[in-house]
């Protein structure tokens, strides 16, 4: 019974590490993907949200100009 809390803590740590690895892989895959047309100025973040590139102005898809 004594080692049960330790086991739970280790399990939590392992699951958060797995989520971190999966998130970074997804992020890398989205960054590598080339965009065509008007989306060329838009960067995709890990959650699929659109974010303006700071280098480009007149970035319409995300609503800011």
Curated annotation (Swiss-Prot):
Propeptide, chain numbering: 19-49
GO CC field: extracellular region
Tissue/organ expression: Expressed by the venom duct.
Pfam family, one: Chi-conotoxin
Cellular compartments annotated: Secreted
Disulfide bonds: 52-62, 53-59
Signal peptide stretch: 1-18
Annotated positions of the 4-hydroxyproline modification: 61
Alphabetical keyword list: Amidation, Disulfide bond, Hydroxylation, Ion channel impairing toxin, Neurotoxin, Secreted, Signal, Toxin
Gene Ontology MF: a single term: toxin activity
Superkingdom, natural source: Eukaryota
Residues with the Cysteine amide modification: 62
Protein name in the entry: Conotoxin Cal1.3
């Amino acid at each position: 019974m004594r080692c049960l809390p330790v086991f739970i803590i280790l399990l939590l740590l392992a699951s958060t590490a797995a989520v971190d690895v999966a998130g970074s892989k997804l992020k890398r895959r989205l960054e590598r993907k080339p965009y065509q047309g008007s989306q060329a100025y838009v960067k995709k973040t890990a959650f699929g949200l659109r974010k303006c590139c700071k280098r480009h102005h007149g970035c319409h898809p995300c609503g800011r100009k």
